[in-house]
Structure formats: structure tokens, C-alpha cells
Amino acid sequence: MVWMTVFHFCFDLSYFKVIVEDFYRDPFWTWQRSSIVSLFLLCAGMGQAVALAQGQTAYRFWRRWGQVMACALLVSIGSWFMYPRSFISFGVLHGMALMLILVRFGFSRLPTAALWGLGAVAVALPFFIAHPFFDTRTTNWVGLVTRKPLTEDFVPILPWLGPMLWGCALMRIEAVRAWMQRPLLPGVRPLSVMGRWSLSYYMLHQPVMLGALMAARHFGWL
């Protein structure tokens, strides 16, 4: 969450022309974005594995899924006002909503080795298979595109299902579960709030930063 916040703050500074950076082509920024999304989905997969192990009810799953989907729709609407030509139609929350269903009702029933293997297949497949059919806004969510669509955020099922499957597999390892249950160090304990309220933080951090930068520009501080 901290890394994501710093990344988005730099993106916002670029949006307000405070710094000049190419967030769409510069490897320094594109690799960071890929790493942040990968960690986000890895943690989502780990969380889903924990929820299943604890016997999460269907009601609680669908309530959480509804929250994710509602936030995804808000992101689409908000991005349409800010970037009408490149609004977000299938970003990280849209992808997560669909992937959570796939993992919950399908892939979670597979053995751990299969999760590792299918995760690798999901990551590799777009490098070998692509077709213009998947280049439209109604089909690019699959991920087998021949070119990246014009959008501010794009997290299709392929390859991004891979990290979520790996997260699910990772939490089946006893040593990992034991390590995750250790008490947090006092210095990082306050950061756990972001983890417990991850969706709320994700939705609020950008409006807060954008509002602060707009206010700073209004008062001539930028």
C-alpha cells in the first residue's frame, strides 16, 4: 500500500506537470506498476485461501465481492470524467472481481501443484497467443490482445490470474502460514490498518491526494 501510494503520488505530480515523467513507456515506472499489481493480486489470492480455510460463508463472500464490484464501477465513472478517451473499463478492481469468482468456485478446488502450474500458464499465455478479436473494449478483458488498449489501467484475466493463483497456493504452505501469523514489529504495526481497510484505502487515497494537489495549485504552492 505504501509503494502504491508513492507511485500514484508521483503519477499525480506528473498529471499536474510538477514533474515530467513517462508513466506509460518508461521501464522505471512500468515495471513498478507491474510489481505493485502483482503484489496486490498475490495478497488477494492469499486472502482468498485464508477465507476458504476459515470457512467463509457465501454471504460474506458475495458481500465483499459486491463491495469490490461497486468500487470498480465508481473507478470507471470517475476515470471517465478525468480521462474520457482512456477511461478505465477493466482495471485492477474489475479484474479482481472476476478472478475472485474463478478462484472461489473453481481453481481453489485444485491441488497446490496445479495452482502453481496454471498460474505459470496464465502468465505465459499472452506472450504466445494474441488475436485482434481481443483488441476491442468488450473483449480485451481476456488479455490476449495484440496491442495494449488506450486506458489508464488495464488488468485483464491473462496474465494477471497467475499471481492470484500463486497467492492461493502460497498460503497452503504451512511455513508461510506460520510466518504470517507472527506478531508484527512495533515499527510497522500502524501500517496494518491499511491492510485491514485495503479497499477503502485504495478508493480514498487518490481523491485525497488529487484534492490536496488541486488545493496546492489553487493557492500557488505548485
Regions found by a protein language model. Give the residues of each.
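Alpha-helical transmembrane segments and their immediate juxtamembrane cytosolic regions
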Residues: M1-L222
